[in-house]
């Protein structure tokens, strides 16, 4: 096992220049032209299949790099956190992003690596041994979801990609993430130390959150990925009692269980979240772990970490206790090299929120379950599933009345169906189906929330012009709140 020269003989600049260097805008284009020129008039050139495969791979690599540049350009130019930390770049002037954003990622990674190298130099022999283990470890990357993302090929899309394709699904990306770090064009993964065993995954939650019943695991990284030591937006490590493997630490250690809850950040305060590219990530993880171990007053924990024979599972327990590693791949992952592991059953509501048609069909086998499913669809504003259920089952006005009487569905307990059909964010196509098929009365007044209002009141409040126009054409009137 070998430690990089950067750690053996540390000689790092005190300040990493974060100003983007200039690149030749034609460099990659010329290289691409040179590599794909072989396919010109291929019918007469007698070119080999191996050569054609090489040309195709070159084009794929170029496109993958171009997509990554777009994702990083968006993140570094739009994220307000990067602007406040003087780590931002200018937005591209044209429609296309240059590879300058990828160069910027490398510079930002070197900046954070420089910070932690200076903080931890020099290393003891125990520290060097632990660092060598981490650097030479294989990683698994885990994406959890209630959606069915694979058949023979695993396809995971970023929130931005999903939105651009008008796909309706439950999201874990919030407005604060988009505004402050703008990393909504990346796919997210938890990170584990590989133990090369069949027992996967080692962890089932990330940052205390169970993101889904299906774990999709890959063992290969991306040349354009980046890693953060925590959730990129929420960089606070939770108290030990929220950790998935809390008993392991509570049973074996004392002081460290009170030390772990903290913000993980760089030199510019708690919003300064260290970022490492794929090449630097193992070194960054190792040095930050060593920095934490040095500060710990728990001698037993320190001895456990520096055990020369530490096994991969124990190392993973430590790293995902001290940190909550998060890996990000630009835009989309598509691979046939993966494992899918079902961790638990998926509830009907979770399957609906994830647009998991396979699970929905397995669970909704009769009209009674269809009532539940339709209520969940309306409550979660899942128009795609609502319309699917309406097309599959012959719903009547009596079905809607029975649905409203269900005691074990919170949406029907709290709201009238008419309210759910017309609330802010509801899809007017679903409302249109209900009215056109006589399932609800256009002017029925709400009996539960906003008692006395009608669907037109809701549409007026949300300023949904399509819904307003449709309701008015069908004779809708306002409820008593707006009567003069």
Swiss-Prot record:
Effect noted on mutating residue 141 to A: Abolished arginine ADP-riboxanation of host CASP4/CASP11
Important for catalytic activity (site feature) positions: 143, 188, 211, 231
Listed GO CC annotations: extracellular region; host cell cytoplasm
Main location: secreted
Outcome recorded upon mutating residue 231 to A: Abolished arginine ADP-riboxanase activity
Catalysed reaction, written as an equation: L-arginyl-[protein] + NAD(+) = ADP-riboxanated L-argininyl-[protein] + nicotinamide + NH4(+) + H(+)
Function: ADP-riboxanase effector that inhibits host cell pyroptosis. Acts by mediating arginine ADP-riboxanation of host CASP4/CASP11, blocking CASP4/CASP11 autoprocessing. This prevents CASP4 activation and ability to recognize and cleave GSDMD, thereby inhibiting LPS-induced pyroptosis. ADP-riboxanation takes place in two steps: OspC3 first catalyzes ADP-ribosylation of target Arg, and then initiates a deamination to remove one N-omega group.
Protein name: Arginine ADP-riboxanase OspC3
Species of origin: Shigella flexneri
Gene: ospC3
């Amino acid at each position: 096992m070998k430690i990089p020269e950067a750690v053996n003989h540390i000689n790092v600049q005190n300040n990493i220049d974060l100003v983007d260097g200039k690149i030749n805008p034609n460099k990659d284009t010329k290289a691409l032209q040179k590599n794909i020129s072989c396919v010109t008039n291929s019918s007469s050139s007698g070119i080999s299949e191996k050569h054609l495969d090489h040309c195709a791979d070159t084009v794929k690599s170029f496109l993958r790099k171009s997509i990554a540049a777009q994702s990083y350009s968006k993140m570094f130019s739009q994220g307000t956190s990067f602007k406040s930390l003087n780590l931002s770049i200018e937005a591209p002037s044209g429609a296309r992003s240059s590879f300058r954003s990828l160069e910027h990622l490398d510079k930002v990674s070197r900046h954070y690596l420089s910070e932690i190298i200076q903080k931890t130099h020099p290393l003891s022999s125990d520290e060097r041994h632990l660092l060598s283990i981490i650097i030479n470890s294989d990683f698994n990357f885990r994406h959890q979801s209630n959606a069915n993302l694979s058949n023979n090929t695993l396809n995971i899309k970023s929130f931005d990609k999903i939105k651009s394709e008008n796909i309706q699904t439950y999201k874990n990306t919030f407005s604060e993430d988009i505004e402050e770090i703008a990393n909504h064009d990346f796919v997210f993964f938890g990170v584990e130390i590989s133990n090369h065993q069949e027992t996967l995954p080692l962890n089932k939650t990330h940052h205390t959150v169970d993101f889904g019943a299906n774990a999709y695991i890959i063992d290969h990284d991306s040349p354009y990925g980046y890693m953060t030591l925590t959730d990129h937006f929420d960089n606070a490590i939770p108290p030990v009692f929220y950790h998935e493997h809390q008993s392991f630490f509570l049973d074996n250690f004392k002081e460290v269980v009170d030390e772990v809850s903290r913000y993980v950040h760089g030199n510019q305060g708690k919003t300064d979240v260290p970022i490492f590219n794929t090449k630097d990530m193992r070194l960054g993880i190792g040095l930050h772990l060593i920095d934490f171990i040095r500060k710990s007053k728990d001698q037993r924990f320190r001895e456990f970490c520096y055990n020369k024979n530490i096994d991969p599972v124990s190392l993973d327990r430590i790293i995902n206790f001290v940190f909550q590693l998060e890996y990000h791949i630009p835009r989309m992952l598509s691979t046939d090299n993966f494992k899918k592991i079902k961790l638990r059953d998926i509830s009907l509501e979770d399957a609906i929120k994830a647009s998991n048609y396979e699970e929905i069909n397995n669970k909704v086998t009769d009209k009674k379950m269809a009532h539940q499913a339709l209520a969940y669809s309306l409550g979660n504003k899942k128009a795609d599933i609502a319309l699917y259920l309406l097309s599959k089952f012959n719903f009547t006005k009596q079905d809607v009345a029975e649905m409203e009487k269900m005691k074990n569905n919170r949406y029907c307990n709290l709201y009238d169906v008419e309210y759910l059909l017309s609330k802010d964010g509801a899809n007017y196509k679903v409302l249109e189906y209900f009215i056109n098929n006589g399932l609800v009365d256009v002017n029925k007044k709400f009996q539960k929330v906003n008692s006395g209002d009608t669907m037109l009141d809701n549409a007026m409040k949300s300023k949904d012009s399509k819904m307003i126009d449709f309701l008015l054409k069908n004779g809708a009137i306002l409820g008593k709140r707006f009567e003069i």
